[in-house]
């Protein structure tokens, strides 16, 4: 595989890929404490795509030629819930199942960081599900550290 490129501002032609790839990767994003039918997860993901369009954001696509390999959705200018300082937030990232383990996630994460710097945002936050070990390794290798823990209990 030749080196993939990252395109900023994914266009309308990328929408079907983003929806399909995002929905297919939902299984690794769901906590076992928050089981939900796949259709509910799909609906919520599509709602997320609509919500971010009302904020300053970028959708980045990793591609090799016309072949789309993964995408990341980063939102800017969000106030931190504790300090109130401006932050960027990686709202979603997905890589095609057959393309995982080839550096696509790292490429997209680097691009998100570059976009955050371009927006003069000194902090990029994200959340990762406890059971998603591959994503945790990716983020930790890139220098991300646990700041808080979100605890939950199934009732």
Where are the language model's segments positioned?
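A short beta-loop-alpha structural element at the N-terminal edge
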Residues: 4-23
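Conserved GNAT-fold acetyl-CoA-binding loop/helix
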Residues: 23-48
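A short helix-loop-beta-strand connector motif used in the catalytic cores of GNAT acetyltransferases and
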Residues: 47-61, 89
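Conserved beta-strand in the GNAT
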Residues: 61, 67-76, 89, 94
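A conserved beta-turn-beta hairpin within the catalytic core of GNAT-like acetyltransferases
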Residues: 78-90, 100, 147
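Conserved acetyl-CoA-binding loop-helix of GNAT-fold acetyltransferases
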Residues: 92-95, 101-114, 118, 137-141
